[in-house]
Amino acid sequence: MKKKFLVKKIITSALPYVNNQPHLGNIIGCVLSADMYARFCRKNNEDVVFLSGTDEYGTAIEMAAFAQNKTPLQICEENRIIHKKIYDWFNIDFDFFGHTTSTAHTKNVQDFFNKIHNNGFFTEQEIEQFFCDKCQIFLADRYVVGTCKFCKYTDAKGDQCDGCGHTYKSLDLIDAKCTLCHSFPNIKSTRHLFFDFNNFKDKLQKLFNTNSQYWSENGKQITKSWLDQELLPRCMTRDLKNRWGVPVPLKDFEEKVFYVWFDAVIGYFTFYKEYVAARSESKELDKNNVFATDNILQDCELVQFMGKDNVFFHTIVFPSLIFATNDSYPLIKKLSVTEFLLFENEKFSKSRGHGIFGLDLVDNTMGQSCLWRYYLAKIRPEKCDSNFSFTHFTNVIDADLNNNIGNFCNRVLKYIKNKNDKLISIDKLEHRDDLMVQTIDKIYKEYLTSFSAIRIREALEKILEISKVGNEYVQQVVSSKIEVPKGFQVAFSIVVLIGQLLEPFIPVSSEKLLKMCNRKKENFCESFYIIKSAEIGDDIKPLFNKLDDSLIERIKNFKK
């Protein structure tokens, strides 16, 4: 049998920018949410590739390198390791995790550009830009600081004022200075390549009309607001100090690089090609052939996860670039957009030291990753901004994991081990059992529907509902004093179901629970059913433990 390489779904997480380590908002905003959905799809017997990678070009990397007296590549290589360490701790199960500084990505971006350029969709324009005579470079927005013309804030950045929030061109700043040497720059002319998005407005509108039914509401609204206005041409090339970007393969533009958002979105296709090439075992699909063709991308469904600040680049920029190639690349089918996660009612800030960042957790001194995966799913900012609160965190872990799910599963398994010699043997179901099965099956199917629609919080709540119904059923059995052993054996099937349903959210805990049940991880079945015969494992112990006082103190006293 030939090995299958084509997949139905390519699930992507917006590429994390590698100038710094991710905080909790970054993690739930795209990477963790995409991981949960990918795990669900795999259990739902769908053909899936989940990929992402670090976004490593642009001025922010250059500035971080300058501040630390390192090269941009050093910054990327060091932080790439940090990112991967954090994602590994969170049990993010990528099928492929790449980086945009790879030679494969450079080639893919340049090939993509050549298609668009050959089709006549780039135009050359001469623009004026700040030029620092002392540094001998054109100054990108991040290399300029000055006084805001709107509010007179004296430390306004080159593209947006932190004082009043206005956006503007860097040339609009008063008394602009170079951030590298603090001298006053001159204004010089430079030629760049522009891409006119308005050429594709009709196609973008058609894409929106066709696929936005599968998009989260915030993604729809943000995209609609752009489509309701004229889409202006945007500069797709840059003059950067270290030429830190994908080089432009065009005569007279050899010293320029592509705008970081031009190359970043193409990264999804690069990483998929790298994924296929790495797994190819046939001469027909060797690495060179994979990168010479785009046929492997046909008939794939693109499902994309991101924060709301990245929507424009994925629903306007990315599809427009695809349209401009005149090739059959997959267009965004499903879109899941998160709002912002606050930390104790304020924005995360590395510079102000406010918030929990990935490296704060990887030593497990504030609990295992399953606790953090669960809580971040619980507060996932799906429809509006949500808030991380230490008090809420500890309350949720105790109420949901210990008192609800943990207590129910432990009660059932301990009874079967101690009172029934670890055995499940059921001949027929009672009327009460049939009613319970109907109730559980209804909630189970709601879980599947919610997760399929990427309503992740809603899916999580369905597990709690199932556990609650299980608790009530067991209590009814005990109170009735009728067929009590049989009742606990019936309840065992609910425990197994919970173990399967938890896997996308907290895979390590799911594995532990299924091991105690002596069951394997399985794909989702069509309906909930009662397991008539089974034998549970020997080592039955609480799935979760109460947060001890010292851990609660460490969490509540954490100051960033």
Curated annotation (Swiss-Prot):
<feature type="short sequence motif" description="'KMSKS' region">
    <location>
        <begin position="347"/>
        <end position="351"/>
    </location>
</feature>
<dbReference type="InterPro" id="IPR041872">
    <property type="entry name" value="Anticodon_Met"/>
</dbReference>
<dbReference type="GO" id="GO:0004825">
    <property type="term" value="F:methionine-tRNA ligase activity"/>
</dbReference>
<keyword id="KW-0648">Protein biosynthesis</keyword>
<keyword id="KW-0436">Ligase</keyword>
<feature type="binding site">
    <location>
        <position position="350"/>
    </location>
    <ligand>
        <name>ATP</name>
    </ligand>
</feature>
<keyword id="KW-0547">Nucleotide-binding</keyword>
<dbReference type="InterPro" id="IPR014729">
    <property type="entry name" value="Rossmann-like_a/b/a_fold"/>
</dbReference>
<dbReference type="InterPro" id="IPR029038">
    <property type="entry name" value="MetRS_Zn"/>
</dbReference>
<dbReference type="Pfam" id="PF19303">
    <property type="entry name" value="Anticodon_3"/>
</dbReference>
<dbReference type="InterPro" id="IPR001412">
    <property type="entry name" value="aa-tRNA-synth_I_CS"/>
</dbReference>
<dbReference type="GO" id="GO:0005829">
    <property type="term" value="C:cytosol"/>
</dbReference>
<keyword id="KW-0067">ATP-binding</keyword>
<dbReference type="Pfam" id="PF09334">
    <property type="entry name" value="tRNA-synt_1g"/>
</dbReference>
<dbReference type="GO" id="GO:0006431">
    <property type="term" value="P:methionyl-tRNA aminoacylation"/>
</dbReference>
<dbReference type="InterPro" id="IPR014758">
    <property type="entry name" value="Met-tRNA_synth"/>
</dbReference>
<protein>
    <recommendedName>
        <fullName>Probable methionine--tRNA ligase, cytoplasmic</fullName>
        <ecNumber>6.1.1.10</ecNumber>
    </recommendedName>
</protein>
<dbReference type="InterPro" id="IPR009080">
    <property type="entry name" value="tRNAsynth_Ia_anticodon-bd"/>
</dbReference>
<dbReference type="InterPro" id="IPR033911">
    <property type="entry name" value="MetRS_core"/>
</dbReference>
<keyword id="KW-0963">Cytoplasm</keyword>
<keyword id="KW-0030">Aminoacyl-tRNA synthetase</keyword>
<dbReference type="InterPro" id="IPR015413">
    <property type="entry name" value="Methionyl/Leucyl_tRNA_Synth"/>
</dbReference>
<comment type="similarity">
    <text>Belongs to the class-I aminoacyl-tRNA synthetase family.</text>
</comment>
<dbReference type="GO" id="GO:0017101">
    <property type="term" value="C:aminoacyl-tRNA synthetase multienzyme complex"/>
</dbReference>
<dbReference type="InterPro" id="IPR023458">
    <property type="entry name" value="Met-tRNA_ligase_1"/>
</dbReference>
<dbReference type="GO" id="GO:0005524">
    <property type="term" value="F:ATP binding"/>
</dbReference>
<feature type="short sequence motif" description="'HIGH' region">
    <location>
        <begin position="16"/>
        <end position="26"/>
    </location>
</feature>
